[in-house]
Amino acid sequence: DDELALLMGGETTEGLVDEDQVPELVDDPVTVLGDVWLLGNHRLMCGDSTSIDAVERLMDGQKADMVFTDPPYGISIVNDSGHVGGDKLAKVGVYAPIAGDETIDVAIEAIQVIKTLSAKVEIIWGGNYYANVLDNSSCWIVWDKDNTGNFADAELAWTNQPTAVRIFKHTWNGMIKASEHGQKRVHPTQKPVKLAEWCFDEYGEKCATVLDLFCGSGSTLIACEAKKKTGYMMELSPHYCDVIIKRWQDFTGKQATLESNGKTYNELLNDNQAKNTD
């Protein structure tokens, strides 16, 4: 399957819903810390991305050809009015906390793990916040948001590639993606799927496997599905793991299963709901 995907190059598979459509957070997630979920060919682990043991369990003996990730980098996202960025509809408290977002320490530890993997392609968003622990690079990616909101007009990603600086233009106005269907964010650092797809086409055409150590709301996973790459996703928050699973299920129409017992996510969700009504 991986070889076929590489031969198909930049083709993109359409989903059953818009690629940036994200389910709402749930109060009582099915996922618990340590769970590994199987989503078609992909793997999702609820675990610590700074733990080499956890990453090895996620990879299950496979090697990551590409690392594409967006670590937390310890910056406040709340503006003076008490809103998150430019979205007047999204109040603080909509989001589950991001583990490690108080400092850049988690990002730095994760970068040390990434260095042990020797992936052919490494793309790390927010690399400008911890450039002192990254190797010098001639190839930074600039995401030009064409932004009229309160968030930054652009974001930077460090890469290990030898090419020149590249610019990706995609409108994302604060919390609202203005260029297409206006889907609201569920995760405060959520990025458009088109951004990951563009990076896959530009830098990862020969990469069959993609690792994201901070999967968040699951945009990287949806890009892997669309571009026929095998995704290995790590996310510490059980709440966001549930979002990722439901997002992938909505996009594909398929069922995720828990590796430990083979039960589907929907079966376990029904079990949870039954317990809560007892």
Regions found by a protein language model. Name each.
Residues D1-G9:
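Amphipathic, charge-rich alpha-helical segments that serve as recognition/docking helices
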